[in-house]
């Protein structure tokens, strides 16, 4: 999983050369959530850039092995994190950032109910010393009821 270059295409890091390296990385994650499919670890996403004084948090550092693309694992993870942040945590805004050129992630973020807010040009340094333009998205508490209902229908939670 950690050695498939497609997994890491849009990430700052190059992946992990060994299980030990992966486990060292995992230990450094503040609050991470693993995606499992058929008992195998296939991805990760986490809260980051927590600003409780503003009631804003980001969901990111997301990677998913190609074997899990299109399975709904990422959609379900985003749903659970959004639900926890807004309903349990009282956050008013949940942010997402992705490489502006990431043609898989951008529609996926729209699919979880996030609104596109613009492009931050030369936003961050990535592998190879390149600068990345980042597409910014957010779900705010006002958006959440409609986004939640849509996600629950897609995921098969509750009545149709």
Model-derived features: where do they sit?
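GNAT-family acyltransferases
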Residues: 1-71, 84-88, 128-160
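Conserved acetyl-CoA-binding loop-helix of GNAT-fold acetyltransferases
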Residues: 70-85, 103, 107
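Short secondary-structure capping/turn micro-motifs that flank functional sites
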Residues: 17, 101-102, 125-126
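Conserved active-site alpha-helix within GNAT-family acetyltransferase domains
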Residues: 102-118
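Short His-Asn-centered micro-motif
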Residues: 60, 98-99
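Conserved catalytic-core motifs of GNAT/GCN5-like acyltransferases
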Residues: 97, 115-130
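Amphipathic alpha-helical recognition patches that constitute DNA-binding helices
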Residues: 58, 76, 93, 104, ...
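Conserved GNAT acetyl-CoA-binding A-motif
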Residues: 87-97
